[in-house]
Amino acid sequence: SAVNGFINSVAAQSPDSQIAIVKFAGKKSDRVGNDTYRDGQYTYNYSQIVKNLTAAGTGADNLKAAVSALHPAGATAADYGMQHAQSIINGAANDGKKKVVIMFTDGEPNHHSGFDDDVANAAIRASKGIKDNGATVYTIGVFSGANGAPISPLSGVSNTNKYMHLVSSNYKNATSMSSTGSSTYPGGGKSYF
């Protein structure tokens, strides 16, 4: 998977760097792990921290095993995912190392189905807190219609692609889908992936 390839790359190039893994799907849980819950006849993933910060060099195998154990089951509660990422970044040592959040997503932000403005706005607000703490946020969309082409202004862009730009550091001052601030990169900016 792309995430395991990323872990391999970081482990080889920067073994002292630390990586945490967060999954986002259904209800929010403050437990660390890969837990699920039942709702009627269906089983869903919690949105939770799967692995706390772990050294990439010595912990790569454990990190990759945690990623490989993840299976889709539930909505795309990106707001909860970004809130967990924000708590990790806020709790990380201020050791002068660059802090980065990479959000991989396969769908529209929601707690049920379709594009949910409330979930998108909460994810954008959490991302703003991450960016305000000096971290860079990258977004990677693996969904139909994903188009990370750099665009400024964001008029005429699908909600999902606009959202991906606003969560990313392309728009450092974005606080919601309607309060985007200006592009961090005038003239079009950078792509999300």
Question: Which functions belong to the PLM regions below?
Answer:
Residues 1-21, 115-120:
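…and closely analogous acidic/polar surface helices at protein-protein or active-site interfaces
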Residues 4-14, 25-83, 108-111, 133, ...:
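Short, charged loop segments at secondary-structure junctions
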Residues 6, 18-23, 100-104, 136-138:
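Soluble periplasmic/extracytoplasmic beta-strand elements of cell-envelope proteins
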Residues 7-14, 86-97, 128-129:
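Surface-exposed acidic, glycine-flexible loop patches that form ligand/cofactor-binding
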Residues 15-19, 94, 176-177:
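Secondary-structure boundary/capping residues
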Residues 19, 46-47, 154:
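Low-complexity, intrinsically disordered short peptide segments enriched in small/polar/basic residues
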Residues 57-62, 91, 121, 125-128:
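Short amphipathic secondary-structure patches
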Residues 75-76, 80, 87, 98, ...:
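VWA/integrin I-like adhesion module and closely mimicked acidic/polar interface patches used
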